[in-house]
């Protein structure tokens, strides 16, 4: 992906999207997928994982990614507020169900994947545990080390929190399959399908020809898979592959 710097992008009109450059950071990839499906143009701005990103902080108030900046509106960093921005900018195709029960299901399960203490949050504890064991005190200098509640205790507890989320997702897909649907909610694509397609890379990454990420990511993601492999129902991976085949593009671009 061809990124702009903060200096190049900050005074431009429209949508600017700060994304983690150089690897398939799950939250960044998920945000990209939302805008891709809706065909919303944006200027990609490089955020560098594990670094201070001083210029990004000065512009947006945030060090991490993704950050959506639209015209002169406040920065948006949460998965839900980014999704709502996308829905406003391009109401069709909607990625949010119309019916309240379906919408509540989609938002709830999306938060289990993307929200604080959810699947990806817990997986990050395991990644940080791997990095701390490999790098020792050097990793403690990384600004991410103290930003997301990592501790050895939280890392140890993470698998027991991830597995029920995977179980809920797979149960949902089995129920939908029985009703004749290939999607998590209803009979059409929603944001939840896109979130899982991207977050699933943590526990079952595509091979290099589809996901040409640095080996570093495979090394820190492998322990996550090992810790929760018993909960990875094949229907979850089949669903991920279907979503990429029908709605997204490969190889991943970052």
Where are these regions (language model features)?
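GST-like fold's C-terminal all-alpha helical module
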Residues: 115-216
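Conserved aromatic-histidine-acidic binding/catalytic patches
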Residues: 16-23, 70-74, 98, 150-161, ...
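Short His-centered aromatic/hydrophobic patch
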Residues: 199-250
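C-terminal alpha-helix
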Residues: 85, 172, 242-246
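A non-catalytic, amphipathic alpha-helix used as a structural packing/dimerization or gating element
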Residues: 101, 105-108, 157-164, 168, ...
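Short secondary-structure transition/capping segments
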Residues: 89-101, 141-152, 227-238
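GST-like domain detector, emphasizing the conserved glutathione-binding G-site
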Residues: 1-140, 247, 251
